[in-house]
Amino acid sequence: MYSLMKKIITEKDIKRQVSLVELLLNHSQITVNELAEVVNTTERTIFSDLQTIKTQLPKGWLINSDQSGIQLKNEQNLLTNELWEIFLTQSISVQLLKELLTIKEVATPTFLARNGLSYETLNRHVKKLNQQLVVYELQIEQNRHRLSFSGEEETIRLFYHRLLMPFTHNNYFFEDYSIHESHYFRFLKRLRQAELAVDTEEVFGICWFFINTIRIKAGCRIPTSLFSTQDQLFLLYAPELEKLYRTEGVYLKDKEAAFAFSCFLDSWNYNNSYPPMILDILHRHSAETNIREFVNRLSESLAIKELEQTNLPENLILLLLKYYESPLLIEQTTKQYHYYLKEYEQEYPELYPHKFALLQQVKESTSMVKKVTNETYFFYLLSLLIQQTLLAVQPYQATIYFIFQGEPSWKAFLQQELNAYLGKRVILEPIELSQLSDITIKKNDLLVSNIPIDTPPMPVIYLSTIPTKNELDRLSDLSLRSYL
């Protein structure tokens, strides 16, 4: 959750301590050895860092340790942001980014005086920070007079959105966030009254509203339009968005209005429940015919007729509307989801020609404001939406054949419990040993038995008549390939 924030912390000790606090928050109990392994340091360093953290904890927080491990306790149900206020404010890079959000340029002498730094020390921190920002096509420009961002304004805002989203809804960084939040909830209420409401990620949308108003007030304007102001969806929502931004004294015009709408659209959920008016606009999208044909081809190729009755066409149209390439989004998608999507591609290699054909049609479309230039990124997003739909209509992924000799009532009970234990992606099918040779084996199929089987045709997991915890854990581990 805090991976981007940890990347931009330039002090090694603070970054390590923030990682430790995060681990302690996420685990009810954890050992020093486990902490050292995750943070990639020595146990001695962990002990030293824990002592430093203990001395800085706010009132109501404490660290307990015993033979079982270490616990971070909160005795008064306090907000975790109290911890971030202490540790993140010690980072020079975090403080610099915080100031550059609200102002176009930071006066170097003022920043040095406020943080008790020499120019040489600041220079070292900026160089380290720029090494992390370069992959996002951002840099901090620095001289003895001023500090400022170098990069596209859209990229700067997206970077801040992803950086701050885990923190801002609990008022970290800015105490007036709750005011923006109340304005945004009234905006959503007006949409419901006008029958324009859709399912959205509320924190996602509020954080966009928050950042956009701050950047506009700082005089940092969007230079290009990311969305057509003639689009029917834009024309529907623009009046309410203009009202929303006026609550913060911001008057949306042209490019800023288009960007504000694209940010609101960014918060829309897939598998949405659209009002009739919105659904009608989506179905009149210029790519709708190509997308319908694409879904029909998938349905025929996989012999899954139900695909045609799913939300996949609307999801793909929303993907095209929301589509935006940035180094930050591309890095997050390709690195975080790489393994899972690689498994998916191996499972459905026959779908690639259909996806490639759709991509070519999309690239040739004159209605696409945001063009597809990174094909890998587009395919990753496309694959996630297709796979989610496939698993919704056909959750079954593997069969576990169950050969069991024992008292029939116990066998029936055990079969029922194993079925529930394995979940709906796995089919537990009881068979007799004599039927094994007649089975058509598919990928991921397993055999579970409490008797020895000579030359089994598939992997076997042996269970005791009354299965042990270790046996069940092994069965669960092997069957989890059918899940995320």
State the predicted function of each range.
Residues 2-484:
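A cross-family "folded-core" feature that marks the main globular domain of proteins
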